[in-house]
């Protein structure tokens, strides 16, 4: 199987019911994108995740101001002072107020937790948050970004 796909798994019980409010699909904007899968997951706590899956990390998918050049990416909105952005085997992720760029395909997790930004990256990368540009080395542990 070499087509892009996205699956949503969420264990839940009667004591811990589902946190997902809705799941919808979206298509990348523009022409020329061969294989793409896009899912929008809305959670009951206000978090919204846009999940991008491409068959070719050299291609670029755009949707509502978001831009991804990767095999896989997750872009969340900001909710309760938190936000998650993940670039999977890619070189670029652009979202409102944030940009991640690498020279070579990498995995980058950029998280905002209680108002503070943290990063884990498999390769050196450049991150732009608002008007602040930060260069980050590869790290397997969370690094606090000084913003």
Model regions and ranges:
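Non-catalytic terminal regions with compositionally biased, polar/charged low complexity
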Residues: 1-3, 10-147
């Amino acid at each position: 199987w070499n087509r892009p796909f996205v699956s949503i798994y969420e264990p839940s019980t009667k004591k811990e019911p589902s946190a997902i409010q809705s799941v919808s699909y979206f298509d990348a904007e523009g022409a020329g994108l061969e294989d793409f899968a896009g899912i929008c997951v809305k959670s009951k706590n206000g978090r919204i995740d846009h999940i991008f899956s491409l068959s070719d990390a050299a291609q670029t998918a755009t949707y509502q101001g978001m831009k991804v050049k990767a095999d896989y990416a997750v872009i969340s909105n900001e909710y309760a002072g938190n936000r998650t952005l993940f670039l999977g085997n890619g070189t670029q992720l652009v979202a409102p107020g944030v940009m991640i760029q690498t020279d070579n395909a990498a995995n980058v997790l950029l998280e905002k937790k209680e108002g503070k930004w943290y990063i884990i990256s498999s390769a050196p990368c450049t991150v732009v948050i608002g008007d602040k540009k930060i260069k980050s080395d590869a790290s397997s542990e969370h690094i606090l970004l000084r913003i």
